[in-house]
């Protein structure tokens, strides 16, 4: 079965001009606004979300966690065969792929998922994975090393660059810990839009046996919905992007870092609670 993960996403923001301005539906959540904000007002007027999580239990093949039923439908676990190919993030051992169905938001090109790899095998057969896991262990042990890092660990790899990261925290789950952060990946000098923004958790069990990679799209009212909205309505940001891309990215990261957890949809605290409930055996 073909799985939809960031590994298979090759579209860049440069060809999004025909995309519609998709706004996240509120479903069982409530937001102060349900339409795209005027970009001139977005920074001044903060939008917040509240959610009644409706906690639901997942427990299959040694993986258990409590997920917010208000955000996700029943997750589906799929066993994925390993691959010796070096393309699309490989080589990698067989792993467990958890697909979150019935995700109510339609603003992102990505789907939320959880990947659980046997870490020893992964490290043995993939040098990039081994280096990423070593970097993760170093950063979790000494969070000061996160401060000046150009890139944070993310597995599996794919053919795009991590252009920024923000909202970084060390989060512990039932039998391990890792890094939670927001990021976007691009193949060119593209603006950060809600189509490409995601929350990720990269973690390792305490015994070192399992590596977990979680990716969940999130929405922030301070960002344009897509490239077309950015091009037409965010004139100053577009000018800054052309003149100083790194400065533009630093401004975006700072804006997200200074945002409260409930200024994101879904609220980051709700996603963090799901991470904290995770146990992998």
Could you tell me what each predicted segment is?
Residues 1-50:
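Ser/Thr-rich, Proline-interspersed low-complexity disordered segments
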Residues 35, 208-209:
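Short, surface-exposed beta-edge/turn micro-motifs
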Residues 44-175, 270-281:
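N-terminal "mature-domain start" segment
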Residues 79-90, 152, 188-196, 222-238:
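Low-complexity, polar-biased intrinsically disordered regions enriched in Pro/Ser/Thr/Gly
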Residues 136, 202, 231-235:
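Short, low-complexity, polar/charged sequence segments that are solvent-exposed and flexible
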Residues 145-207, 215-224:
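Signature of long, low-cysteine stretches enriched in small and polar/charged residues
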Residues 218-281:
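Surface-exposed amphipathic alpha-helical segments
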């Amino acid at each position: 079965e073909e799985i939809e993960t960031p590994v298979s996403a090759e579209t860049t923001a440069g060809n999004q001009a025909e995309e519609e301005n998709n706004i996240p539906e509120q479903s069982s959540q409530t937001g102060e606004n349900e339409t795209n904000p005027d970009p001139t007002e977005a920074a001044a007027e903060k939008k917040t979300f509240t959610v009644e999580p409706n906690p639901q239990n997942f427990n299959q093949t040694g993986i258990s966690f409590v997920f917010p039923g208000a955000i996700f439908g029943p997750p589906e676990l799929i066993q994925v065969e390993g691959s010796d190919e070096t393309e699309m993030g490989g080589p990698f051992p067989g792993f467990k792929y958890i697909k979150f169905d019935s995700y109510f938001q339609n603003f992102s090109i990505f789907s939320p998922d959880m990947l659980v790899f046997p870490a020893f095998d992964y490290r043995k057969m993939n040098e990039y994975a081994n280096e990423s896991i070593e970097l993760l262990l170093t950063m979790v042990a000494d969070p000061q090393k996160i401060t000046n890092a150009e890139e944070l660990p993310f597995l599996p790899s794919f053919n795009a660059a991590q252009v920024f990261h923000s909202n970084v925290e060390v989060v512990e789950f039932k039998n391990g810990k890792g890094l939670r952060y927001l990021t976007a990946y691009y193949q060119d000098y593209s603006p950060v839009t809600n189509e490409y923004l995601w929350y990720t958790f990269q973690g390792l069990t305490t015994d070192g046996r399992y590596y977990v990679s979680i990716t969940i799209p999130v929405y922030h009212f301070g960002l344009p919905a897509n490239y077309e909205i950015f091009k037409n309505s965010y004139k100053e940001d577009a000018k800054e992007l052309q003149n100083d891309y790194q400065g533009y990215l630093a401004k975006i990261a700072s804006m997200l870092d200074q945002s409260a957890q409930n200024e994101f949809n879904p609220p980051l605290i709700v996603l963090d609670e799901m991470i904290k409930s995770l146990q992998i055996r």
